[in-house]
């Protein structure tokens, strides 16, 4: 299997993309195609020992910047690195795409080139969060600002399959993010989504609150992209703030410094758990292919791990499992939806 890497996406392209790709090829034996300006990419490759590594370069003359509109990736910049990367998957020249570029453009290009898997109205961006019990998958974290109840049900099904297939969770528990655990809480979106999810074959646990994401009460949390993105950015900011405040406190006293030295291994383990680079990127679920969206400021380690997860996603045939799960549950939640419509009309 081969992973196409958008070598021109991200704040530090193509340097970190090339470095991460070389590391992934060397450590995991993954075949990689770097998509971007051939001259610039080859210049970066020359800095590394790539002997015996299966790394090729595909030229793309255009780049979709962070401030470009998502439609530019599809309509205007037809030779952009992100679009060409997805074209490689479409033409069976690659099996997955990794990009640290414009997330909206990545999602738009993936949908335009590869389309959606059967049974999905809107793809979603998912993100793994570290918890007290392991990991929790949250989706959508930015793909769809406005959602309908059916979207959240489909997100839950995709998340359940991803958690089972890629995260190795035996029986994923599902929750809807709300402002309280009581069924009376929430809004129209969460209440109707909850009713529909109860009719599915999923192990649905009901509402969960923001704090429950990190205590590991459930394995998959679904919400609309507006709320999910706020959760994501808040978590990133909190992790950075806690780290900075802790460093400042340690500097205040020699005793604190000695304590830090004695506890250094614990601090290292903690940092590893909350470090987003360990997870690489956020899978784009729902497109008829594999896409991994990385943070714009990703370093080489994040790119390397994103390539690893993208390869794993493609290797396990997760999308086919999603289609099967969607087909299994479609008549169940659609029947419940018709019941809700009849009740509203009556």
From Swiss-Prot:
GO biological process, one term: phospholipid biosynthetic process
GO MF term set: phosphate:acyl-[acyl carrier protein] acyltransferase activity
Enzyme nomenclature, EC number: 2.3.1.274
Major subcellular site: cytoplasm
Compartments where located: Cytoplasm
Catalyses which reaction(s): a fatty acyl-[ACP] + phosphate = an acyl phosphate + holo-[ACP]
Metabolic or biological pathway, per its Swiss-Prot or TrEMBL entry: Lipid metabolism; phospholipid metabolism
Keywords: Cytoplasm, Lipid biosynthesis, Lipid metabolism, Phospholipid biosynthesis, Phospholipid metabolism, Transferase
Domain of life: Bacteria
GO cellular component terms listed in the entry, alphabetical order: cytoplasm
Function: Catalyzes the reversible formation of acyl-phosphate (acyl-PO(4)) from acyl-[acyl-carrier-protein] (acyl-ACP). This enzyme utilizes acyl-ACP as fatty acyl donor, but not acyl-CoA.
Oligomer status and interactors: Homodimer. Probably interacts with PlsY.
UniProt-listed HAMAP family: PlsX (MF_00019)
Family to which the UniProt record says this protein belongs: Belongs to the PlsX family.
The protein, known as: Phosphate acyltransferase
Source organism of this protein record: Geotalea daltonii (strain DSM 22248 / JCM 15807 / FRC-32)
């Amino acid at each position: 299997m081969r992973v196409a890497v958008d070598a021109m996406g991200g704040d530090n392209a193509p340097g970190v993309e090339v470095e991460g790709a070389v590391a992934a090829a060397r450590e995991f034996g993954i075949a990689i195609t770097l998509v971007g300006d051939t001259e610039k990419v080859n210049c970066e490759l020359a800095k590394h020992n790539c002997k015996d590594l299966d790394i090729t370069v595909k030229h793309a003359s255009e780049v979709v910047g962070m401030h470009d509109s998502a439609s530019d990736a599809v309509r205007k910049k037809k030779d952009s690195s992100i679009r060409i990367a997805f074209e490689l998957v479409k033409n069976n020249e690659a099996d997955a795409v990794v990009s640290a570029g414009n997330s909206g453009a990545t999602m738009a290009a993936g949908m335009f080139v590869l389309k959606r898997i059967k049974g999905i109205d809107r793809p979603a961006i998912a993100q793994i969060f570290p918890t007290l019990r392991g990991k929790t998958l949250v989706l959508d974290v930015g793909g769809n600002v406005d959602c309908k109840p059916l979207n959240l049900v489909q997100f839950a099904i995709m998340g359940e399959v991803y958690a089972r297939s890629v995260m190795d969770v035996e029986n994923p528990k599902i929750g809807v993010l709300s402002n309280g655990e009581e069924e009376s809480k929430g809004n129209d979106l969460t209440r109707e989504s909850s009713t529909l999810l109860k009719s599915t074959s999923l192990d649905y646990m009901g509402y969960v609150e923001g704090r429950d994401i990190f205590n590991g009460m459930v394995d998959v949390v679904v919400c609309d992209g507006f709320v999910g993105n706020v959760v994501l950015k808040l978590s990133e900011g909190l992790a950075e703030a806690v780290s900075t405040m802790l460093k400042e406190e340690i500097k205040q006293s020699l005793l604190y410094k000695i304590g830090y030295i004695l506890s250094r291994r614990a601090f290292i383990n903690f940092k590893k758990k909350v470090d987003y680079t360990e997870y690489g990127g956020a899978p784009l679920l729902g497109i008829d292919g594999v896409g991994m969206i990385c943070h714009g400021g990703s370093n080489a380690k994040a790119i390397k791990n994103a390539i690893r997860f993208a390869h794993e996603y493609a290797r396990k045939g997760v999308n086919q499992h999603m289609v099967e799960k969607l087909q299994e549950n479609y008549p169940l939640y659609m029947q419940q939806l018709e019941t809700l419509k009849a009740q509203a009309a009556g």
